[in-house]
Amino acid sequence: MHKKYFIGTSILIAVFVVIFDQVTKYIIATTMKIGDSFEVIPHFLNITSHRNNGAAWGILSGKMTFFFIITIIILIALVYFFIKDAQYNLFMQVAISLLFAGALGNFIDRILTGEVVDFIDTNIFGYDFPIFNIADSSLTIGVILIIIALLKDTSNKKDKEVK
């Protein structure tokens, strides 16, 4: 018999990501001034203290009420999808846990300070990517995993239709 929900694994992932996110942001916020930067991997990775009161790339800057409302809706929707659509599917449950943790990590920043602490500053193939944080990484990985799960599910359905 397969487990319907992997609650322990899902909670562990979400708690770990949120704690790691908040601890790294706290270290950056308390040890670096905004704009301070140091090189970790030459021409690829810097740690740069930055604040963002919008979404990715500063979109919707200063719209905190919007972010509060939309984040609460997203967190509730993620719990709903976890319960309704991720049954017996550890892969999907991990993906949803990463999305939940990422959304919660940035939500905590917005509640406490009205802005998100960003610090991971990368230069990928000559493109100076916008500065981001652990929560953003968790969101991105969660989205990628959900896309993979959906593509895999679509592929499995096509295989079953052929048989």
Swiss-Prot record:
One of its GO terms (molecular function) is aspartic-type endopeptidase activity. The chain crosses the membrane at residues 11-31, 63-83, 88-108, 131-151. InterPro entries: Peptidase_A8. Keywords: Aspartyl protease, Cell membrane, Hydrolase, Membrane, Protease, Transmembrane, Transmembrane helix. It holds the Pfam family Peptidase_A8. It is found in: Cell membrane. One of its GO terms (cellular component) is plasma membrane. It catalyses: Release of signal peptides from bacterial membrane prolipoproteins. Hydrolyzes -Xaa-Yaa-Zaa-|-(S,diacylglyceryl)Cys-, in which Xaa is hydrophobic (preferably Leu), and Yaa (Ala or Ser) and Zaa (Gly or Ala) have small, neutral side chains. GO terms for biological process: proteolysis. Its EC number is 3.4.23.36. The active site is at D118, D136. It is an enzyme of class 3 (hydrolase). It is a multi-pass membrane protein. Pathway: Protein modification; lipoprotein biosynthesis (signal peptide cleavage). This protein specifically catalyzes the removal of signal peptides from prolipoproteins. PANTHER family: LIPOPROTEIN SIGNAL PEPTIDASE (PTHR33695:SF1). Belongs to the peptidase A8 family. This is Lipoprotein signal peptidase. It comes from Staphylococcus aureus.
